[in-house]
Amino acid sequence: MKQANRLTKREEYSQVLARGGTYIGPLAIMKTLPNNLELSRVGFIVSKKVGGAVERNRAKRILRESLRTTGLKQGWDIVFIARAKAATVKCAEMERVVKHLLGKAQILSKTDEKTSFKTD
């Protein structure tokens, strides 16, 4: 994921967590906030409740991969908070949950205007 598409600062995370809308799924919680930019930015939070470092990193990889293939509307800051089962599921299941959450928030884009997070 490109640097421009990531939330990196504590203030950015705090703002989304405090003022953003909340959407709850079985594997992740999603917080969203409009950012008035030409792109959407995403951040991930995986606590130690998920497991050790290996499990936490796996959960983040699965979430990133789910977003890589999914189109988003522009102009949103999104934070995904992984739940305890997130590290044990297959990527297809997480992708289904992520698309469901994005659809509930009406951030899931049509194919003609999508912003996908392709890696370089």
UniProtKB/Swiss-Prot annotation:
Keywords: Endonuclease, Hydrolase, Nuclease, RNA-binding, tRNA processing. SUPFAM superfamilies: Ribosomal protein S5 domain 2-like. It is an enzyme of class 3 (hydrolase). GO terms for molecular function: 3'-tRNA processing endoribonuclease activity; ribonuclease P activity; tRNA binding. One of its GO terms (cellular component) is ribonuclease P complex. Its EC number is 3.1.26.5. The keyword Cell division does not apply. One of its GO terms (biological process) is tRNA 5'-leader removal. It catalyses: Endonucleolytic cleavage of RNA, removing 5'-extranucleotides from tRNA precursor. PROSITE patterns: RIBONUCLEASE_P. The keyword Secreted does not apply. Pfam families: Ribonuclease_P. RNaseP catalyzes the removal of the 5'-leader sequence from pre-tRNA to produce the mature 5'-terminus. It can also cleave other RNA substrates such as 4.5S RNA. The protein component plays an auxiliary but essential role in vivo by binding to the 5'-leader sequence and broadening the substrate specificity of the ribozyme. NCBIfam families: rnpA. Consists of a catalytic RNA component (M1 or rnpB) and a protein subunit. Belongs to the RnpA family. This is Ribonuclease P protein component. It comes from Dehalococcoides mccartyi (strain CBDB1).
